[in-house]
Curated annotation (Swiss-Prot):
Gene (UniProt): yigB
Family matches, as PANTHER family: 5-AMINO-6-(5-PHOSPHO-D-RIBITYLAMINO)URACIL PHOSPHATASE YIGB, N-ACYLNEURAMINATE-9-PHOSPHATASE
Protein name listed in UniProt: 5-amino-6-(5-phospho-D-ribitylamino)uracil phosphatase YigB
Keyword Zinc-finger belongs to the record: no
SUPFAM superfamilies: HAD-like
Gene3D superfamilies xrefs: 1.20.120.1600, HAD superfamily/HAD-like (3.40.50.1000)
GO biological process, one term: dormancy process
InterPro entries, sorted: HAD-like_hydrolase, HAD-like_sf, HAD-SF_hydro_IA, HAD_sf
Cofactor descriptive note: Magnesium. Can also use other divalent metal cations as manganese, cobalt or zinc.
Keyword Heme: no
Native source species: Escherichia coli (strain K12)
Amino acid sequence: MRFYRPLGRISALTFDLDDTLYDNRPVILRTEREALTFVQNYHPALRSFQNEDLQRLRQAVREAEPEIYHDVTRWRFRSIEQAMLDAGLSAEEASAGAHAAMINFAKWRSRIDVPQQTHDTLKQLAKKWPLVAITNGNAQPELFGLGDYFEFVLRAGPHGRSKPFSDMYFLAAEKLNVPIGEILHVGDDLTTDVGGAIRSGMQACWIRPENGDLMQTWDSRLLPHLEISRLASLTSLI
């Protein structure tokens, strides 16, 4: 544990999910593979559909709806819906197909192997402070055993713009009824988590990714209050 700024009073903790509480890389790789297979098998006209086609459609959807990137679930839905429209399905069929694809996506997205260390750490921390999850993604903690640790979960899109925008940080403080400066946000991303939290008035803990090096960042404004390499280190703050 390394300290870079004076750590003040802590009345609550907020957490990023992906790559902070578990390794999200294998989850996403498997989910994207299964999601593509589902779309390809959904209709004969989509048999040759590839991830490159999805990326092209995602870009087109974002150009038409610039703010949609804040809601990754809606963005994916609209992209798949457009793929089905392009394949010749009716508007009703495309909407139904996109909904089915998203149900399949959510199923695979929630098959996450959470380390026991994460469970043990969150359990201890939750005895001391209220915990909140703040995510730009579409993981659902209640589906992979983490839901009970959190007072609530905030997701970009339904609860505001994505991090590093301040919407969800401000909303967390409001819902917790805690001064924002007394909240410690924990995350792996120096921009969305550390930078976003600090610019919103929170304290920030950077959980350093493998091979991460704070000294390689060019933006000194991203300096966290503290840096850890293991989630369990947070229990020393109790």
